[in-house]
Amino acid sequence: MASDGARKQFWKRSNSKVPGSIQHVYGAQHPPFDPLLHGTLLKSTPKVPTTPVKAKRVSTFQEFESNTSDAWDAGEDDDELLAMATESLNSEVVMETAHRVLRNHSQRQSQPSQKTTEPEPEPQPIAEPPVPPSGDLRLVKSVSESHTPCPSESTGDTVPLQRSQSLPHSATVTLSGTSDPHALADSALSKRETSRLDKFKQLLAGPNTDLEELRKLSWSGIPKPVRPMTWKLLSGYLPANVDRRPATLQRKQKEYFAFIEHYYSSRNDEVHQDTYRQIHIDIPRMSPEALILQPKVTEIFERILFIWAIRHPASGYVQGINDLVTPFFVVFICEYTDREDVDKVDVSSVPAEVLRNIEADTYWCMSKLLDGIQDNYTFAQPGIQMKVKMLEELVSRIDERVHRHLDGHEVRYLQFAFRWMNNLLMRELPLRCTIRLWDTYQSEPEGFSHFHLYVCAAFLVRWRREILEERDFQELLLFLQNLPTARWDDQDVSLLLAEAYRLKFAFADAPNHYKK
């Protein structure tokens, strides 16, 4: 009994701190300097009977700060944080969040920017966070949880908590001598673009360009100044060795014009006149009209398409191939023009010799592209038929509701997705977006054939809300054939590609996932 009493007294007297002891945890959401909160927490803590101990002096905030100055140092708690970070999330929550982000982004992009001439209000002194009533235990949200309104949102009487309001005055720091967030963002963007451009130039200038590294760097977009050379390398038109490139260019250009001299004069022969006539009819229907309707450009496109059709009798000329010439030609011609708008490039100021070389480069790069998707344009176009079927199965797995909605209104995938495969989405996107899309296609293995399938799936699901709102076959088909992408930019394409990559990662190596 005596030993039991001693053991009992021992546990009563033990006040040493051990790992796992219950202590109050303070953070940005629960500041230790809030007297009301501190008192509330102390009152809500149940008292444990202990032996009388000497009262401790109340710690000041300076002591608290010094005692917790190493709160962010690496310690044993890091393992718990890493474990929490690796916990799997609910797939439905992830999908819903992704769709909501894409939808909100689209709504912000579709709203025209409105400039007001009202003077900006003078900055008001930063107010301290309001103290909650004594009966209300709700706390002010932390910076990461507070809602920052978009410029398009209407402001009411209640002002959401901003970052500068939730931090002490000393934490509000002005960077680069300016407080304008837009100026800071533009400056950071400019520095990042300059850095990426330097990386491209270093890769391209080396004696032997590392094509694998070039593909990785090109996936997220290629800067305009280095895009022509990068496309020629990624398409396989030019060799990686710098010293061999001039000779290869000269040889290929000479070979192309030998084809023209040999074949082009036969365009009006009975055996070829139908092909040439169809090309002559299709070119004025292409876009952008400001470029295509220039006589020099029309002649260049006619020669490129006719020579390709003659040299590839297995497929010949098929409508849709003509659209694939435009991105290459525009990218190569922009190297010699200062106009930023790719839809309105004027070739009248480009020397004739330069135009000849661009024509040859365009032909060979387009030929390299078509070599990988030629089954799309052979008899009955089996490649497109197969890809449309795969798209239908893929969409039925990733968004069954959209799939059932289309099927319930008797909308067949061939009715809208055939053009997506035949023209590689060129009729659905502005030319500037197509060029950005092709940056990634050329850096992806089988980008124009395999990865394009996942881009089409992400593109269809991107319009989920609008599709589900349509309740009529004609309205559904009209919407799917005229998608509102006129205001899209590189950021929209990047979001589309990111979603497509996620789908590829989930389904590409698991073909059984296509089927239920």
From Swiss-Prot:
Modified residues (Phosphoserine): S144, S166
Top-level lineage group: Eukaryota
Biased composition (Pro residues): 122-133
A Pfam family it matches: RabGAP-TBC
Residues with N-acetylalanine modification: A2
Rab-GAP TBC domain ranges (all copies): 221-445
UniProt xrefs under PROSITE patterns: TBC_RABGAP
Keyword Nucleotide-binding: no
Entry's transmembrane regions: none
Keywords of the record: Acetylation, GTPase activation, Phosphoprotein
Skewed-composition ranges (Polar residues): 107-116, 143-179
Region (Disordered): 63-88, 102-186
One GO MF term: 14-3-3 protein binding
Biological role stated in the UniProt entry: May act as a GTPase-activating protein for Rab family protein(s).
Quaternary structure (record): Homodimer. Interacts with ACBD3 and ARFGEF1. Interacts with YWHAB, YWHAE, YWHAG, YWHAH, YWHAQ and YWHAZ.
UniProt protein name: TBC1 domain family member 22A
Species of origin: Mus musculus
Gene: Tbc1d22a
